[in-house]
A protein has these predicted regions:
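Conserved helicase motor
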Residues: 92, 113-121, 135-140
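ATP-dependent helicase/translocase motor core
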Residues: 1-84, 89, 93-109, 126-127, ...
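Conserved motor-coupling elements within RecA-like helicase/translocase cores
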Residues: 117-131, 149-150
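Basic, amphipathic juxtamembrane/active-site segments
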Residues: 72-73, 77, 173-179
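Conserved RecA-like ASCE ATPase "motif II neighborhood" in helicase/translocase motors
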Residues: 130-174
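Conserved helicase ATPase motor motifs in RecA-like P-loop NTPase domains
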Residues: 59, 162-165, 178-181
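Acidic/polar loop patches that form or flank catalytic/metal-binding clefts of enzymes
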Residues: 109-114, 165
């Protein structure tokens, strides 16, 4: 399929600098399929439930790269490029790696929330920024309270990498209260 090949070249081939060389990374099948399924849901879903979901990939399958490829493809789509993207991770190393990978792929400013106050400010802004935050910032916000209705926009996507705690319980309620749509 020529269209699939072109899509693979345009949206699923990234170059990352490593030790002074550029390394080409091309999506594996599960990454290609996951990104396109998410894009389909975002473009065709009419409710929050229809637009949301979980992508489950095994350890070492390239989940972070899948998220970066999704962001790259969204930024190239006229309907989805205005979305704010919020990356939630559970490890400092993963947070830094994700920011660097996206910066290398897209050459776009990434805003890292270093505190709860900074996170509130970044989430409140009505913009198409890319924000990264450690899951601990949401936990701290949950403990502090006053983290509701920060941004009512329906043009916000939260992508959690290895942050299972964001899916259920109090932490999920905190994120949903802050970003209700």
């Amino acid at each position: 399929h020529p269209a699939s090949f072109l899509d693979l070249m345009q949206n699923f081939t990234l170059f990352q600098p490593v030790d002074g060389r550029l390394i080409k990374k091309v999506a594996r099948y599960q990454q290609y399929r996951a990104v396109n399924k998410v894009m389909e849901r975002l473009m065709n879903g009419t409710t929050r439930k229809e637009k949301s979901g979980v992508v489950w990939h095994t350890q070492g399958s390239g989940k972070s790269l899948t998220m970066v490829m999704l962001a790259v493809k969204m930024r190239r789509d006229p309907e989805l490029k205005q979305y704010k993207l919020v990356f939630v991770t559970d490890r400092t190393q993963l947070d830094g790696q994700l920011s660097k990978t996206f910066r290398d792929a897209q050459n776009e400013t990434i805003y890292n929330a270093g505190s709860v106050a900074e996170l509130k400010e970044l989430l409140s802004k009505d913009s198409s920024d890319i924000v990264t935050a450690m899951v601990q910032k949401f936990q701290e916000a949950e403990q502090e309270g006053d983290f509701t209705d920060l941004n009512p926009s329906d043009k916000i996507i939260v992508l959690a990498d290895e942050a299972h705690r964001t899916q259920f319980g109090g932490l999920a309620m905190t994120i949903n209260a802050a970003l209700p749509n």
